[in-house]
Amino acid sequence: MSLKPKVSHADHILGNGQADLTIVEYGDYQCPHCGAAHPIIKEMMAELGSQIRFVFRNFPLSEMHPYARPAALAAEAAALQGKFWEMHDAIYENQNLLSARLLLDIAEQLDLDMPKFKSDIQDQELLNRVDGDFESGMLSGVNGTPTFFVNGQKFDGGAEDLVQILGEN
């Protein structure tokens, strides 16, 4: 399966925005497999970040993970204040404590404008963005998390497999 839609300026991009290698992760902030993949991806980006364009798209599996969608909204609200990746990392690093209170605590620790953050997490536009990511995942053949795409093609493997293949090339 191929990635739909293609990566654009509207995505959350880390690393080299002009890199020849693009990795897209569809993730769920409460998924334990995504949580386990997070430090592997961080290490990969520390080593190869100048050669990779890494994109994260929300794929909250809300029926199994009740805090996945609120966490996605919190990350999107933080993005409006220029702190998407900081919120993203903090959520995964505290995944075992995930709660509504934790999301507010992280926002405070990131020194976000709290009235704006609290308003933004309820904004229909952010709900639409999270839903749009989810729908794009469905169109792209995502059926679990994490799911990775390498240069637009679905990668059948986990984060460790991805790093191993990148290390070989």
Where is each model-derived feature located?
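A short beta-strand-turn-helix
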Residues: K4-L21
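Structural alpha/beta surface segment adjacent to cysteine/selenocysteine redox centers
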Residues: V24-E25, Y29-E108, G167
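Generic detector of short alpha-helix boundary/capping microenvironments
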Residues: L3, D11, S62-E63, P70, ...
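Short clusters of hydrophobic/aromatic residues that line enzyme substrate/ligand-binding pockets
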Residues: I13-L14, L98, F155
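C-terminal cap of thioredoxin/glutaredoxin-like
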Residues: L3, D20, Y26, H33-M45, ...
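A general structural-boundary detector
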Residues: A10, Q18, N58-S62, A74, ...
